[in-house]
């Protein structure tokens, strides 16, 4: 495992759901003994925040378009809890495949 994976967590307003999703990801990372760092922001600022934080992946709890230059996961399961474990598996598998965490 390499450096911590930088995860940009985004939603429509960058308030409650962003914080909830980030905390859930941090807790799951600790449980799996994977190093991550989370950054938070608004979907409207997507391109600016990706350029500023240079994340390894994005978890968005609001709708956004796929970007060819970065992996984007839907974070809706972190809020609804439906499919949450599957999302964790996808995210942490991706992190491992990138040699991060």
Q: Model regions: which residues?
A:
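Proline-aspartate-enriched helix->loop->beta-strand connector
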Residues: 54-55
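Short, polar loop motifs at secondary-structure junctions
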Residues: 44, 58-65
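Glycine/Thr-rich phosphate-binding loops of Rossmann-like dinucleotide-binding domains
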Residues: 67-68, 82
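Conserved active-site segments centered on acidic
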Residues: 2-43
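Short acidic active-site motifs
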Residues: 44-49, 83
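Short glycine-rich anion-binding loops that position phosphate/pyrophosphate groups of nucleotides
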Residues: 13-15, 63-65, 78
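Ser/Thr/Gly-rich flexible loops in soluble cytosolic domains mediating phosphotransfer, phosphorylation
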Residues: 73-101
């Amino acid at each position: 495992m390499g450096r911590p994976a930088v995860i940009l967590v985004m939603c429509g307003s960058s308030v409650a759901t962003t914080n909830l999703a980030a905390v859930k990801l941090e807790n799951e990372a600790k449980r799996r003994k994977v190093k991550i760092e989370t950054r938070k922001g608004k979907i409207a600022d997507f391109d600016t925040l990706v350029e500023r934080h240079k994340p390894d992946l994005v978890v968005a709890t609001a709708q956004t378009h796929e970007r060819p230059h970065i992996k984007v996961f839907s974070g809706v399961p972190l809020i609804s809890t439906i499919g949450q474990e599957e999302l964790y598996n996808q995210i942490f598998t991706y992190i491992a495949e990138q040699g991060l965490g």
